[in-house]
Amino acid sequence: IYTDPDTSSGWMSSTPSNRLYERLKAYPITDLAPVFDRGVRGRTMSGPKNLWLLNKVHDTGIRTVIDLRTHDHTDRFEQNVRNAGMDYLSVPIDKRHTDVHDIIAGLPGLFEILDRGDFYISCAMGLHRTDIALAIYYVFHPTVAYENVPEMRGHRVDGHFRCEDIAARLNSIIKAITPEELKMLELPEPYDTEFAHRKKKLFEVNRQF
């Protein structure tokens, strides 16, 4: 979590404890990372060899697994998640190929679980689509405090933040979103000014990590 009471003097950061991350980091979960103080993210644990890991995830207190995969989504993974005692939510998200209105339609369910906590949000590569999902959550869900900027971990080259793919998806949503979709997300119309402020904040803070 980042706060900047005086942006002229630089960024001030604080990292809240995350009990789920602390419990899970002992296990071989690829790209495991905390999400705020109430969830974790990482690579999709599909395949028979990961069944034991899904059980460990459940045992630490995870209630819902969020799957961001698109064409590589499988019913078998959903069944494995449910057999391990957790709820499963598929919200296909990527940087450009998924229809933007399909993404918007899935946001209320995604936001509800991210607000509630006790989730594991995953994609095939662990960090790239989870970056995009968390960026959408921050920019299009103003109940998230303005200073609670999520860290973009998957879009870095030689330590430098690359925002192009994230910006492209955020921009595609604000350009396509309809008045009905704004109402569904409980966003004011127009939303352009708040969108611009939050996108700028997201990118500025992530350049400081």
Where are these regions (language model features)?
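Conserved lysine of the Walker
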Residues: 129
